[in-house]
Amino acid sequence: MKKVLALVVAAAMGLSSAAFAAETATTPAPTATTTKAAPAKTTHHKKQHKAAPAQKAQAAKKHHKNAKAEQKAPEQKAQAAKKHAKKHSHQQPAKPAAQPAA
């Protein structure tokens, strides 16, 4: 297949190229001298298996509790008390009534 393609390309370029293409297509690659060395001894390495983690419920895997959640929850307040901060009252505290001497 390569020779046919090379000849078609060579015909398009000219006959001088055809001889060059035929030579390059048919020349085999030079063979290297074969000296076989003894194969290296293969060592098999054992894999270390990790210990299996304790099984957990599916919900426990997904939801992690934070340390903040374990602290004591603040005292609950009414919704209005959360929104409206109390302001200082300008009234003076009432003085206790003088008790008559008995």
Curated annotation (Swiss-Prot):
HAMAP family: Asr. It is found in: Periplasm. Residues 22-58 form a propeptide. Residues 22-102 are annotated as: Disordered. Residues 1-21 form the signal peptide. NCBIfam families: acid_shock_Asr. Residues 22-41, 91-102 have a biased composition (Low complexity). Required for growth and/or survival at acidic conditions. This is Acid shock protein. Belongs to the Asr family. Residues 80-90 have a biased composition (Basic residues). Proteolytic processing gives rise to the active protein. It comes from Escherichia coli O45:K1 (strain S88 / ExPEC). InterPro entries: Acid_shock (IPR023497). GO terms for cellular component: periplasmic space. Keywords: Periplasm, Signal.
